[in-house]
Structure formats: C-alpha cells, structure tokens
C-alpha cells in the first residue's frame, strides 16, 4: 500500500485507498536509511547499534527529544539533526512509523506473486510453478536472449537449460560473450531472481493480451481457452493498473535533506518487474520490538530473526561477489538469500519453514502477522481494547427502574476519575490535579458527593459477551451502590441472555457529548423494548414475575367474600386490606370503561349468586349486559391499578403469553415511556405476589395418574399384536418397527395429557407445579410428562455429527422420574442426556462461525435512498396449511411492508391497501381476518433496484420502531444478527429434553379443517376390497394417481378454503361434491412407505426380477414367511450386463399394458403370474421417517447448507422443460429419462440405477419438477426457474428450519437481505465490445455500467475516406461518427460504415455466503475475512482501489462508519440559532431607525 509522502496516512482526510505492488523507488522513498548490520542492541549498553535493525539514526530516537550521543536534550532542539550521531531530535513515537530498507545484492522474487494460485509470474511468463521454482532456486538456466548461438542451436527464448548445456554453448561461442549485454546477437541465459526480473521487464503486455484474446476467439480446444483465460486475467490486471505516463512529482515533505533530487517521483501503477525485489523494506522497530525480560534476557519479535537472516546472507553474498568467489558458492548463497526473503514474507507457505531454536515452532512472518484471528486485521483493527471500561459479576437489582443499573462505587470512581478531578478543581476543593488525585485515593467523603453530581445524566454502556445482537450492549443511568457487583434490572436479562449464576458484564463510559447523546437516545434500555429480529417485545417478565402475576389474577371458587358487589375499584382494595375479601374471590365491581376479557360474564352470575336470590341475579345480569358491571377477581383489580387508561381493564388470567401480547400492544399504542413505567410496576407486583403466595414445589405436587397402568397394559397388548402379525408374515421388519414406535408414542402422549389434566384439577388449579407450568414461568409439558407420566421413547444418538435422524430405541422407559427408573432404564437414558451436553459445546462454535460469515456478507448493506422506483415486487399468498402447522401467518408476511400493487378484496372488489402504502399492524390484521384477500404483491429487498445498498421502500418498516426504515440504517448487520443470534440459541437448546425422543407420530388420517363442499382435482381412484383387522371385507376407494388435489370450497361463494394434496395409494373417504363437516376424515394414507399401486386389471409379470440377482428372499426365522426385497444387483453381474427390475401388468393374451419399475430396498407384494385388480399394492418402498424432532442439530447444518448454496449430497434430477416423461434405454449403471414437449424439444437425463424415480411413463411435468427423489439443488432452481424462484426457495427453506425445528420467529426481510447478497454477482458469457472478460464474476451493477458504456458507441467496419485517426474495428461514439459522415457527405467522399457495438451477456450466479463475502468489491473487507494473502496479492496486481463504502473497511482504517449518525451527509451540518439571528435582525433594524 503506497501513501504519497506528502499526505501522511495518519491524517484522517482520505476517502479511498489504492493497493499496488511497491516499486523499488517507492520503497526507497519511504525509507529513512539502509540497514547494514544484523545487530539489534549493544549487549553492554543495551542501546541500539548504529546501522543495525534498531538504529536510531534510521528510525528515530528511543527517548523523547534526545539524540543517541546525548549532545541535544530537551524539546527546544526539535528537528535538529545531531552532527555527531546523526539522530534527529524528535519524539520516540516516530519509531512506530519510520521505515528502513535493505539493498539486495541480487534481485529476489516476492513469494506471494510466485506461490499464489494461479501464480502471477507463471501466468505472465507462461511457465508452470514447478519450472519457475527450478529457475528461481538456481537449478536451471532460462534463455533470455537466444542471440546467434541460440538460432544455430535451435534454442528459443524461455527455454530451460541445464548447467552442462549452458556451459557447452558458452565454451563453443566464446567470442559471443564479449558482446554488449543489450546486443541482440548476444546469447544471454540466467537463473534466479535476476533471470525472472529480466524476463518480466522484457514483456510486451499489449501484445500478449492481443494473442490471448485471439486464442479465446478462435481456439477449438476447451483446455487451451481455459488456460488463455487464466493468463489473460493476470495480463489485463497489469495492463489496467499501469499507465507509464502517469508520474506524479512528490510534494516536498521537509523530511528529506536530499528532498529536491529528481528521482523523487512515484510510478502510479504496476510494472511486472516489481514482483521481483531489489530492495526489501524494513518495518519500523516499534512494530517488532525487543522487550527486556527479568534476568537480563530479551524477548524478541520473530521478525527480527527473519530480518537478521536476510541481512547476514545479503552481506555475505556481497563479500563473496567482491572476492570473486566461484559460481557454485555464489549460487548457493543466492539461493539461501532467496529463501531468507521468502521466509520473511511468508514463512507458513513453505514446507521447510524456518523454526525457532528452543520450541521448534515456525517463526511468524509478515504474512502471519496479517492472517487469522490473531492477525493485524481481526486482532487489532476490528477489535481493540477500550479505555474507560471495567468488568464485574452481575447480581439482580429488583428495585431498579428499567433504565437504571447499579454501579459499585469503587468502579464508578475509577471510570469517572477525570470528570471528578475536573469538578474538584473547578469547585476549588482541590488546588491541582495531583491534589485532587490524592483526595480520591483517600476516599474523602466530598468525593462521593462530587461523583453523584458527575454521574447524574451520564449514561454508561453495559455489555455481556457474547454480544450476539445489538441488544447485547445497552445504555443505563448508573446509580451508586455499595459492594463490588453490578446490579442489573431483571427485565433486561432476556436481551443480554444473562442469568445470575456468576455471569460477568463489562461497563464502558461514553466520553464525548455526542456519544453520551447517542447512548441516551438510541441505546437506553427503556428505548429498546422490541426485538429487531421479529418485532416482538423482548422485555417480557419471566419466572418469578410471571408466577406472581398469574397467582394474583387467578380465580378460586368459594374464596372469602365471593359474589360481593363493590361501588368502585378503590373500595375493593380497602376491603382486601381489611381482610373482608380474599385475593382470588370473584366479585362484581361497578365499571363502565373499556374491558378486555375472554369468558362470558353473564354465565358466571349463576355460579356466584345462590338460586334463592333470583331478583339479585336478574338485576346483576341486566347491569352486566348494559356494560355497567364487571365480574372480576380482587387480584385482577389490584393488577389493573397499574394499567394505562387507554388500554382499559384487562379481565384475564395473566400468563407469559398474555403478558407478551399486552406489552406489544402497549408499545405500539402508548409508546415507550408509558410501557417502561408499566413494566416496572408489574415487575414489583410480580415479585411481591410470588413472595406472598409462598409458591414452592415438593415431591407430593407431582401426581402420577392412576390410569397410567391401564394405558401401558393396552400398549403392551398392541405391540404384542404387531409382533404377532410380523410373525405371521404380513408385516416387514421395517413396518413392525415403525408401528411399535407409533404405539408407544401415542401412549406416551396419552399418559402425558392425563397427568397434565390431573395436575390441572388438583387443589382447584392451585397445584404449584401446574401453576409454574401453566403460567409459562418454568418447565414445559414435555418435562411434566417425564416427571409424572412416563419418560417414553429414547433416541439412540448417532456417531455422525451430520445430524441424521437418530434411531429410536423401541423399548420405551415406562417409569417416570417421580417413581424412579430401573437400572436398565437409567442406563438407556444416560446416553441421550450426555450427548445433549456435548452437542451443546460443539455446536456453539458452528453457530458462531455462521454468524461471522453472515456479518461479512451483509455488512455493507445500508439503506441509501428513499425509493428506487422499481415496479417489481414479491407475490405472497395465504397458505392455510402452513398457518395450521404453526408456520408464519399471512399477516406476518405482509406486515410492515410497502404494497407494490393495490391489494384488493376479491369478494367486493374494494381496494384494501393502495400501491406504495405501508401495511401497518392494523391493516395486516384486517387483511388476515378478511378472507376476500388471498394474495398480495409487496415490495422486497430481493427486487430492489438501487445501485448501492437498498432503498427504504423495498425494506419496509424498521421492526423495532414500527416506522419506515431511515436512510443510513445498517440493515445488513441487523439481518446477520437476527439470523445468527437464534442460531446460537438453538444449539444450546438440545439437552433440556434429556435425550427423550419427540415428535414424529406420522398422521395417517387427514381431517377437514373447515366445513364445506369437497372438490376433487385430478384425483383418479378405483374401488378395491380389503380385509380389515377384524377380518371383515370392506370396499375402499384407492387413489391411483399422483399429485391429485382435494379442495374444500365454500358452497356460497365458491372460494377455496383449503387445499390438500392426496398421496398416491391413499384411501379416499369422500366423493366429489359431498358436503363435509369440520374434523371429518377425508382420506387416510400410510405414512411409513410409498406404495406402488396397480391402475388396471391383468396378471403380474416379473421382468428382470431374479432370485439372488435382483432380489433376495428373506425367510423370517421367527415366522417362516418369505419376504422379497429388491437388492442392488450391480455387484452380482459382469460389467457388460444390466438389469432393470420391474413388474408389468399383462393382459390374458400376454400384451404388456403398463410397467412399474421397482427401486432398490422395496418389498414386493405380488407373485409372478398373480391376478391383479386395480388398487392392488404391487410393492412398498420404505420411507426413512425423521422421527427425532426438536433437536436443531439437524437444523444448523441444514441452514449452513442453504446459506452456502451447496449442492445436496444426493440431489434430485430436475426437469428443465415442461413436457411428458418417457423412459429410454437402460445401461449398466443408469437408465435414461426423456422429457419431450409439444414443440419437439427434448431433454435426456441419466438416473443411477436404484434411485427412486418419481415420474412414470407418460406423466406431465413442469419445468423445475423433480423427476427422482432427493433434495432439489438451489443451483438447479436458478438455472431452470430463474433468480426469483431460487430467492423465494432459499428464504422459505431457511424459514422452515427456524420455524419448525426451533419455533424461532425471524422476519422474512432479514433472510431476504442475505439472499440478495448471494445473488449480487453475474458471470459474463459473451463480453461483446465491453472490456469484460468471458467467465468474469462481477457485480450486477458493474455489468450494467459496462453495457451502458458501449450503448452509445459503434464499431467501424469500413473507414471509407475517414481521417487517419479512425481505425477499422475500433469503437467510437455514435455522434462523433455521425458528425464525420455529415462532413464526408458534404465533400462527396465515401462514408464510414458502422455497426452498433455489441453488449455483453451474462447469467446470474448464486454464491454461498463465504464466497460472496470474499468476492466483495472492498479489498480490506475481503482481506479481513479469509484468505488474507490471496486477497491482498490479487488486489495489488490489479491496482484495486477501496472506496471505503462498507462498515468494516471504515472500522479498520479508523473512520466513522457510514451508517446511522456516521453518514457522510451529517458530517457537514452547520447549526443555526434562529432566535439569536432574529434578535440580531431586530436590533439591526432598530439601529437603522435610530
């Protein structure tokens, strides 16, 4: 990196940084002198040796304002250079910035440019790395100029010669060696860096580029073109970065005595020969310090050792050259010098790295100082240690307000010391800073008073590591406390993910007024009540507080004073204080305000008022109906004392869910201030009543239901029945296993439900265990099941970490934790429990790494403009299936977005939301309830067209403030935090289940969700008689078509209420047009296998189904029944042979009517020659059911796979066109599937044998439909259905993992931001007339700009009588040529013939987040992410400029980030005092009058 001498890099006023290869001139220009000796300091005086690696003359004095010999001391001699020792009198800090250099005896190749992949030097010289290595390390000669001897011997430039060959030519043509070196007839061959230097210097890059482009256009060989393209990229990079005429004269700096010598200009741009170094820069000594240890020894930086080796070898080589040593010795010394310089620049690349003497570890070279977590970028530039900070253990501060924290006095006095000292001096309490410090050290009482004043209104920042999202750092108003621990408000724990079991937190003091202002306005905890990731409240009461509120608002029948009538709320509280009425008593209160309640109050009158008081009953009912009376409990009256007026009276049992909804409602209706006040009040109430209720649990509170024994007996009976069937041979082993697991899963859930009900009824619902559970304070139904029901089935953990479904051990644990486990049961359950704990620690690292990659890819996405003006948007539909399965509701998808088109109610054609309007929470809720709105088109980040960053309209509202996002908001970072933070949460959640298997009762019956009329779409079914378990024959409708749909429609409006996909082989229970009621069974299907069903009558005929070859007959030892399973037959046959097992249905005459391929592992259900009726099962293909739910271990790798856009391990083959399927010929290892459309277009796919083919002969498929099973690759979706489809697919798939596996809510817009970044690049196909290269990966905006640049240009085909400057084949502006043609026509000359310039073509590329982060336009950002040396090498060669637009680059160079209040437009704001100006104007006017 070159800074021109005139502008010191330390001044902050630069706006971009250019990277280039340092030329020898620039290295010398930065250097203050040559380092000649390897010595560092004198062993006796410990002062730096002159001309050594620490020399004061070169690098500056080691003491402030003092020269080496001591002649000049004090600041008054500033700038004088001592005449005795030559040291300039200045501050010692210059030793951090002044550089030196070493002049090498022979040129040395820079290892970065030679060892990078592809090798930059290799690409320019067209030599392989192996050959280059032999030249550089002095093994072979390379011909630089063949001259006459070369021509005679047939030797060309760049040929490699061995020593014998070289000496043979030299001796043969002795007189040739007397010629001048630059004589073209002289034969020149060299080795080492010198040879490479001469070769690079002699290159003509323009000529090479022309030839390579020719190869690209004309060559037929793919390999040649690929090689040419690789070389062309490097050649073009050099050509673009170097224009030799650009010489900038350097401004005088006043630093050099020889300032005005003419050599002091710097070449801007790179010459190829700069990759070979003649001068090595020496970095400032303070950056490679010598630190004295006790005992007179020194610890040194590895760099000093590496420099020492270079200097020693260089000096030795100079001596050897002077004494004319033999060539062999010189060559050895030169090679050693090359190796020493290699080690200095990059020691880790070498196989034989230089090691230290004692510990035998490789020395840390300059490259290692930049790389990795401990390197310069990540250790010192992105994460610095901070002054004015402290850390301590946290304890709970229940009496704090939401915006406060308790700060120990001893910490506060340290942190605020400068402020306190200033106050003490200002007030005259202390005379000087020194005496003020003494006062503070003495802990004088006056100090505490001053500290109180200083702290008032000065916020501090609290941070808890790991800071996973922006709520991990919040501002608080400190209050001074005794003790040594920081007190934290209990409601902010969720945001920090803190608990009080020994967590520590750091305190930081914002110093400047701007920082204090930002802290108190933007970061104050009472302003951060909403999670940016989902828009839901984060300051939600938990544990004790919830329990207290629940206890307070719970009603108990028959409590003291039940059914009394009160005149006002105050009266109720007086009565309660007088103990006339119980806390849980249900009472009547006069109230006519707004009420939010669930139950029907009129019905309660009958239970609360005795029958004999009929008149009173009637009067109460009439009052309630007129909304003048309220039926509530005493506790709810107390709770509602703290409710803001606007919300009204909350007449509900308050549990965590209700509390959360309430806080969300408050925050949007009454604002943060009121909400914070309310939160503090309910915190007090919650803790208070949790204490008063005295709620604690004992063993007797866990009640085991008596029916448990009965259920277990039933289950044992059912599983015995299944085993009996298996023994009879009607079930396969796989089916037996699946059914047994199902039985126990159902039983386990049944027992759990009953134990839950039992707890609910115990003590009128006041069982402490049940209250803790029901209020949401602690525990889950899952835990109750294990405590009082049965532990149930346990997963068998897998060896692999890839998160495959763990198999379930089919013997359940029948005991629960209250009864205690048997030894065997305990042993079985240990395994899962331990795995949970070890998984946790392993996965946290993965989640952290995912977060880092997300941040890196999205860090420069900032809202830059208000509206990009795009007309495109995302299409969102209401999907009832997803909503019922607990996925995101339609409302959540459209909330906070801007409508791209009008949203219309189809039933009455009314516009609900106009295009360009924000869909607020109210509008979204109205749309959710209005079934007339089926779909909406919303603006999205995915379709945003702004060139840099994104626009506010496409992003929508900022979730944490419910307003349109502001310009300057760093939405990329927020997106990365929102996705990464739950990732780390998820991984930590596995072990709470204790390894108990969950989920996975596969639903066999599908029931109607609404009542309505059945409509069958593409459902073909046949009647088929089956024998049920009880031995009765029944006729069923069996579906024989794939992908049929069953819709339930509203008979009045004809609207589709719900769609179901009817699986192949399902038993259909309803008919077309039939009316169904809610919960009626529509169809049932077998979940554990895919069935192959006969569609027509005939006889079964086996084709290629041979015993021992394509199928094996397994006789079950227990049952004696034979089961036929298709096996992988490839190993059984010779290479040329092939088989394709299939079952055909033939007519009586033997004509084949339909064939069904049977995949490997399927079980046959028919015999050869058996009579078939439609609906018969031919074979079943077992499915692997993913039975272990809940554990995101499967989820995190899945998320990573999607974000990295990896191709799945066994991807589905996808049809590229719409058409009909037919099967082609069968080869040994694959069969061919053809898809042909009506236009005669045909695509052929080869499927590996044994892969299950989903399509059958004659099926109609759409482009993008999978033809075989397996996951669909996102790359295929992009290729076939385009970028929009793949974006939607990625967002939906990632959303599914978070939603289903973990129940975490993340707003779509965050995922969209990341997915947008993954599709920012395009690959150039044909460059046309632009200066792009084919195969280049560039930003979409760069591509559009390149095309716009040639849009107004034309190419000259025939120059006619044009002036000489017009060259055929070149591009010119259209208007210039038109002007010339006008003149030519006027003069009667022949005109210039032109054609429009060709634009480039490209296709979008989907990059994973790692590669997207490395491909970023900013060099600094990419270098600080991964592969630092590679990024810097490429940047230097191409002369890249970093414009510092992202956040990361600016942090690294120490500037304000260009987001939020750091936006460039805010830097030049001038404030005006309007009142003062008006006053002045009035004064001026009155003066004039006078």
UniProtKB/Swiss-Prot annotation:
Zn(2+) 1 binds at residues 67, 69, 82, 85. One of its GO terms (biological process) is DNA-templated transcription. CDD domains: RNAP_beta'_C, RNAP_beta'_N. Its cofactor is Mg(2+); Zn(2+). Its EC number is 2.7.7.6. Zn(2+) 2 binds at residues 868, 944, 951, 954. GO terms for cellular component: DNA-directed RNA polymerase complex. PANTHER family: DNA-DIRECTED RNA POLYMERASE, DNA-DIRECTED RNA POLYMERASE SUBUNIT BETA. The RNAP catalytic core consists of 2 alpha, 1 beta, 1 beta' and 1 omega subunit. When a sigma factor is associated with the core the holoenzyme is formed, which can initiate transcription. This is DNA-directed RNA polymerase subunit beta'. The lineage of its organism: Bacteria, Pseudomonadati, Chlorobiota, Chlorobiia, Chlorobiales.
């Amino acid at each position: 990196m070159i800074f021109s001498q005139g502008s010191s890099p330390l001044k902050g006023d630069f706006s971009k940084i250019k990277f280039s290869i340092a030329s020898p001139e620039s290295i010398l220009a930065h250097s203050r002198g040559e380092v000649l000796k390897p010595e560092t300091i004198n062993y006796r005086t410990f002062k730096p040796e002159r001309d050594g690696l620490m020399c004061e003359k070169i690098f500056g004095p080691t003491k402030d304002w003092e020269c080496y010999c001591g002649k000049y001391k004090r600041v008054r001699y500033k700038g004088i250079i001592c005449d005795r020792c030559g040291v300039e009198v200045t501050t010692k800090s210059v030793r951090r910035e002044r550089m030196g250099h070493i002049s090498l005896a022979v040129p040395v190749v820079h290892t970065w440019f030679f060892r990078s992949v592809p090798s930059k030097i290799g690409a320019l010289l067209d030599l392989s790395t192996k050959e280059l290595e032999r030249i550089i390390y002095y093994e072979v000669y390379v011909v630089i100029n063949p001259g006459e001897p070369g021509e005679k011997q047939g030797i060309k430039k760049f040929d490699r010669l061995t020593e014998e060959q070289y000496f043979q030519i030299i001796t043969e043509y002795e007189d040739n060696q007397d010629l001048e070196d630059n004589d073209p007839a002289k034969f020149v061959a060299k080795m080492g860096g010198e040879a490479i230097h001469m070769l690079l210097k002699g290159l003509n890059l323009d000529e090479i580029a022309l030839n390579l482009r020719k190869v690209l256009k004309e060559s037929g060989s793919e390999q040649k073109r690929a090689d040419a393209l690789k070389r062309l990229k490097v050649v073009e990079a050099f050509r673009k970065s170097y224009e030799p005429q650009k010489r900038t004269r350097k401004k005088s700096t006043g630093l050099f005595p020889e300032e005005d010598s003419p050599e002091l200009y710097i070449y801007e741009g790179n010459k190829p020969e700069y990759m070979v170094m003649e001068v090595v820069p020496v970095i400032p000594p303070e950056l490679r310090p010598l630190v004295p240890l006790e005992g007179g020894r020194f610890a040194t930086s590895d760099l000093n050792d590496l420099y020492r080796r270079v200097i020693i070898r260089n000096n030795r080589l100079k001596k050897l050259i002077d004494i004319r040593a033999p060539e062999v010795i010189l060559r050895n010394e030169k090679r050693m010098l090359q190796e020493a310089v290699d080690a200095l620049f990059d020691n880790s690349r070498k196989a034989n790295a230089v090691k230290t003497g004692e510990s035998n570890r490789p020395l840390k070279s300059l490259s290692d100082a930049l790389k990795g977590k401990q390197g310069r970028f990540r250790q010192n530039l992105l994460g610095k240690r901070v002054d004015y900070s402290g850390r301590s253990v946290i304890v709970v501060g229940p009496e704090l307000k939401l915006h406060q924290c308790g700060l120990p006095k001893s910490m506060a006095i340290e942190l605020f010391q400068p402020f306190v000292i200033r106050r003490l001096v200002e007030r005259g309490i202390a005379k000087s800073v020194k005496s003020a410090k003494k006062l503070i050290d003495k802990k004088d009482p006056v100090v505490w008073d001053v500290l109180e004043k200083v702290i008032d209104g000065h916020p501090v920042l609290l941070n808890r590591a790991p800071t996973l999202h922006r709520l991990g750092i919040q501002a608080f108003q400190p209050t001074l406390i005794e003790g040594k621990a920081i007190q934290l408000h209990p409601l902010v724990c969720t945001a920090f993910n803190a608990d009080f079991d020994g967590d520590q937190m750091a305190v930081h003091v914002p110093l400047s007024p701007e920082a204090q202002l930002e802290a108190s306005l933007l970061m104050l905890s009472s302003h951060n009540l909403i999670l940016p990731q989902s828009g839901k409240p984060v300051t939600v009461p938990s544990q004790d507080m919830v329990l207290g509120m629940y206890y307070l608002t719970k009603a108990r029948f028959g409590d003291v004073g039940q059914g009394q009538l009160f005149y006002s709320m105050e009266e109720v509280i007086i009565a309660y204080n007088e103990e006339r009425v119980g806390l849980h008593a249900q009472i009547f209160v006069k109230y006519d305000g707004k009420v939010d309640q669930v139950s029907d109050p009129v019905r309660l009158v009958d239970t609360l008022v005795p029958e004999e008081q009929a008149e009173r009953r009637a009067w109460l009912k009439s009052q309630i109906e007129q909304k003048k009376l309220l039926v509530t409990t005493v506790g709810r009256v107390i709770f509602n004392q703290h409710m803001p007026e606007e919300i009204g009276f909350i007449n509900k049992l308050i549990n965590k869910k209700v509390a959360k909804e309430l806080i969300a409602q408050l925050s949007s209706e009454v604002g943060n201030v009121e909400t914070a006040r309310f939160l503090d009040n309910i915190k007090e109430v919650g803790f208070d009543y949790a204490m008063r209720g005295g709620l604690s649990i004992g063993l007797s509170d866990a009640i085991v239901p008596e029916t448990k024994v009965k259920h277990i007996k039933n289950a044992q009976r059912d599983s015995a029945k299944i085993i009996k069937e298996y023994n009879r041979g009607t079930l396969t082993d796989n089916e037996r296993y699946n059914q047994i697991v199902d039985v126990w899963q159902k039983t386990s859930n049944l027992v759990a439900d009953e134990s839950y009900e039992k707890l609910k009824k115990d003590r009128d619902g006041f069982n402490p265990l049940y209250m803790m559970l029901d209020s949401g304070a602690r525990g889950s139904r899952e835990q109750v099941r294990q405590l009082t029901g049965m532990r149930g089935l346990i997963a068998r953990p897998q060896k692999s970490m890839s998160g495959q479904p763990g198999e379930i051990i089919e013997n359940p644990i029948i005991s629960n934790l209250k009864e205690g486990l048997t030894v065997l049961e305990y042993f079985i359950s240990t395994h899962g429990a331990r795995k949970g704990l070890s998984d946790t620690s392993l996965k946290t690292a993965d989640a952290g790494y995912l977060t880092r990659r997300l941040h890196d890819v999205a860090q420069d996405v900032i809202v830059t403009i208000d509206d990009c003006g795009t007309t495109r948007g995302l299409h969102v539909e209401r999907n009832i299936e997803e909503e019922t399965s607990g996925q995101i509701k339609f409302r959540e998808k459209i909330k906070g977005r801007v409508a791209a088109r009008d949203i219309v109610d189809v039933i009455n054609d009314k516009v609900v939301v106009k295009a360009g309007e924000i869909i607020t929470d109210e509008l979204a809720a109205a749309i959710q309830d209005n079934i007339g709105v089926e779909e909406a088109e919303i603006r999205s980040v995915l379709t945003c067209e702004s060139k840099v960053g994104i626009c506010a309209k496409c992003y929508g509202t900022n979730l944490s403030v419910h307003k349109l996002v502001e310009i300057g908001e760093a939405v990329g970072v927020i997106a990365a935090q929102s996705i990464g933070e739950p990732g780390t949460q998820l991984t930590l959640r596995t072990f709470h289940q204790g390894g108990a298997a969950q989920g996975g009762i596969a639903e066999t019956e599908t029931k109607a969700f609404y009542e309505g009329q059945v409509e069958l779409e593409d459902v073909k079914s046949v009647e088929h008689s089956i024998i049920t378990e009880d031995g009765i024959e029944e006729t069923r409708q069996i579906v024989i078509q794939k992908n049929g749909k069953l819709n339930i429609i509203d008979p009045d409006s004809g609207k589709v209420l719900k769609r179901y996909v009817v699986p192949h082989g399902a038993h259909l229970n309803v008919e077309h047009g039939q009316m169904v009621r809610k919960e009626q069974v529509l169809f049932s299907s077998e979940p554990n296998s895919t069935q192959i069903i006969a569609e027509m009558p005939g006889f079964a005929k086996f084709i290629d189904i041979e015993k021992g070859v394509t199928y094996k007959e397994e006789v079950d030892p227990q049952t004696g029944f034979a089961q036929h399973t298709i096996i992988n037959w490839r190993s059984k046959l010779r290479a040329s042979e092939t088989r394709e097992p299939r079952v055909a249905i033939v007519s009586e005459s033997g004509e084949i009517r339909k064939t069904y391929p049977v995949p490997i592992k399927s079980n046959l259900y028919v015999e050869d020659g058996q009579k078939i009726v439609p609906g018969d099962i031919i074979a079943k293909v077992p499915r692997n059911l993913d039975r272990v739910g809940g554990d995101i271990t499967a989820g995190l790798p899945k998320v990573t796979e999607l974000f990295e856009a990896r191709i799945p391990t066994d991807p589905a083959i996808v049809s590229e066109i719409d058409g009909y399927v037919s099967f082609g010929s069968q080869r040994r290892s694959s069969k061919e599937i053809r898809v042909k459309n009506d236009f005669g277009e045909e695509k052929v796919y080869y499927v590996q044998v044994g892969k299950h083919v989903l399509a059958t002969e004659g099926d109609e498929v759409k482009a993008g439909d999978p033809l075989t099973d397996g996951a669909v690759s996102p790359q295929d979706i992009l290729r076939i259905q385009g970028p929009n489809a793949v974006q939607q697919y990625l967002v939906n798939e990632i959303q599914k993992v978070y939603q289903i596996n973990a129940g975490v809510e993340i707003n779509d817009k965050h995922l969209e931001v990341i997915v947008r970044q993954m599709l920012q690049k395009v690959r150039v196909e044909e460059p046309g007339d632009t200066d792009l290269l084919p195969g280049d990966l560039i930003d979409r905006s760069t591509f559009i700009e390149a095309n716009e640049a040639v849009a107004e240009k034309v190419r000259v085909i025939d120059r006619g009588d044009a002036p000489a400057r017009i060259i055929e084949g070149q591009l010119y502006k259209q208007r210039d040529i038109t002007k010339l043609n006008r003149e030519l026509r006027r003069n009667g000359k022949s005109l210039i013939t032109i054609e429009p310039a060709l634009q480039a073509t490209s296709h979008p590329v989907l990059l994973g987040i790692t590669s997207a982060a490395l491909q970023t336009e900013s060099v600094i950002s990419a270098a600080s992410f991964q592969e630092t040396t590679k990024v810097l090498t490429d940047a230097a060669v191409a002369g890249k400029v970093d414009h510092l637009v992202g956040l990361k680059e600016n942090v690294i160079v120490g500037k304000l980030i260009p987001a939020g209040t750091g936006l460039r437009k805010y830097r030049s704001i001038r404030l005006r005092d309007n009142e003062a100006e008006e006053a002045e104007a009035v004064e001026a006017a009155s003066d004039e009058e006078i």
